[in-house]
A protein has these predicted regions:
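Intrinsically disordered, low-complexity terminal tails and inter-domain linkers enriched
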Residues: 8-46, 129-157
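Class I SAM-dependent methyltransferase Rossmann-like catalytic core
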Residues: 97-123, 127, 131
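Conserved class I S-adenosyl-L-methionine
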Residues: 243-275
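A short glycine-rich, Lys/Arg-flanked "PGG" loop and its adjoining helix->strand segment in the class I
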Residues: 231-245
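Conserved Class I S-adenosyl-L-methionine
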Residues: 51-52, 289-344
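Class I SAM-dependent methyltransferase SAM/SAH-binding core
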Residues: 156-211
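N-terminal auxiliary segments of SAM/dcSAM-dependent transferases
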Residues: 4-5, 9-12, 18, 35-98
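A short acidic, Gly/Pro-enriched loop at the edge of an enzyme's catalytic core
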Residues: 210-221
Length: 344
């Protein structure tokens, strides 16, 4: 059963409401990260709590908000535009793929808002809150990235690598009232939603296979949900006292749909492959399995399948016909493995 309470659900839906697209551009200035202050406006990439942690994806120099245009610039004059919808484009070169379409993103947003994956959001939020509560506290002055020598500063940064619409990131931030968040993705339609997923979340267009546009040791918690893992970069940006939370499917995930729809099965070696991708950089700290029974309509089944790798490996026409033949509603198992990885 989901542990997302009705109050938390209302809070998540409320913070997902859009903000005005035109927001004042802040000029980056030194910020005292040891003394929390009230949030006076929704966070975006120009906010001091975020921009202090960002780095130029070209030269790795610090970034600051430009005063003449809506952009971030580094001392070497590399410039990165802020979209009207609130995210910053920190992509260099062509994206490896364009990600989900606007229609796919809209369907995914509706699916998540219906609570079908609350089992994942809740597990991430509870694990992140527990982890930060027990991690080392502040010690010493903060670095330029906002972190202290043995702690995370007053505004711990939560990064979601492959964030999609930012739904899971928003759930984690709702459980961490002093944290700020950054959603990274290559899909612009998803980032338009991620940029307004939570008042304390910013969003950036970035390829997580490349160097991440973040300072060393800048991140307290790094989320990775059904997304590729860049072990080298994850280790570089994660604070030594931080945690990487990785969510992967178990072999029971969507098992009721695999044969009837001809979906890809979860690789039996999935756990080993995840460990290999992080080997030498992280050590597994704990693993928990989270399961929920979903009751879905046919359209929701189509959305769910479209959120996974089978969407790229199954004939669309045959898949649509198989979904139409399903009895409605459909009962499906969601089963995921959440592993906490510690930096070595």
């Amino acid at each position: 059963m989901s542990t997302v309470t009705p109050a938390l659900r209302r809070r998540l839906l409320r913070v997902s409401a859009p903000y005005p697209s035109e927001q004042p551009v802040y000029t980056a200035q030194p910020v005292d990260t040891t003394r929390p202050t009230a949030l006076t406006r929704p966070v975006d990439a120009t906010h001091p709590w975020i921009v202090a942690r960002l780095r130029c994806p070209v030269c790795a120099e610090p970034l600051a908000a430009a005063t003449d245009i809506r952009a971030l610039r580094c001392p070497r004059r590399h410039s990165f535009d802020l979209a009207r919808q609130g995210y910053v484009n920190l992509l260099t070169g062509r994206a490896p793929h364009v990600g989900d379409t606007a229609e796919m993103v809209a369907a995914r947003a509706d699916f998540l808002a219906a609570g079908h994956y609350d089992v994942i959001s809740s597990a991430l939020a509870e694990t992140a809150a527990t982890w930060l509560a027990t991690a080392t506290g502040d010690a010493g002055p903060p670095t330029a990235s906002g972190a202290t020598a043995a702690g995370f500063g007053a505004y711990p940064l939560v990064v979601d690598a492959g964030a999609g619409t930012g739904w899971h990131l928003a759930a984690v931030l709702a459980a961490l009232p002093d944290a700020v968040g950054l959603a990274l993705d290559v899909a612009k339609p998803a980032l338009r939603r991620a940029a307004r997923a939570h008042p304390r979340a910013a969003a950036a267009l970035a390829d997580t296979w490349q160097r991440l546009p973040l300072a060393d040791r800048s991140t307290a918690v790094l989320l990775n949900v059904f997304a590729p893992r860049n072990g080298v970069e994850f280790r570089r940006v994660l604070h030594p006292a931080g945690a990487l939370l990785v969510v992967t499917p178990t072999d029971a995930h969507l098992a009721e749909l695999v044969d009837v729809l001809g979906l890809l099965r979860v690789d039996p070696a999935k756990t080993d492959r995840v460990a290999d991708s992080l080997a030498g950089h992280f050590t597994p700290e704990q693993t928990t399995v989270h399961t929920a029974r979903l009751t879905l309509g046919r359209a929701e089944v189509a959305t769910l399948v479209g959120m996974g790798p089978s969407a790229w490996h199954t004939d669309p026409g045959r898949l649509a016909a198989a979904i139409d033949a399903l009895p409605a509603p459909v009962t499906v198992t969601a089963s995921v493995r959440l592993t906490v990885w510690r930096p070595r």
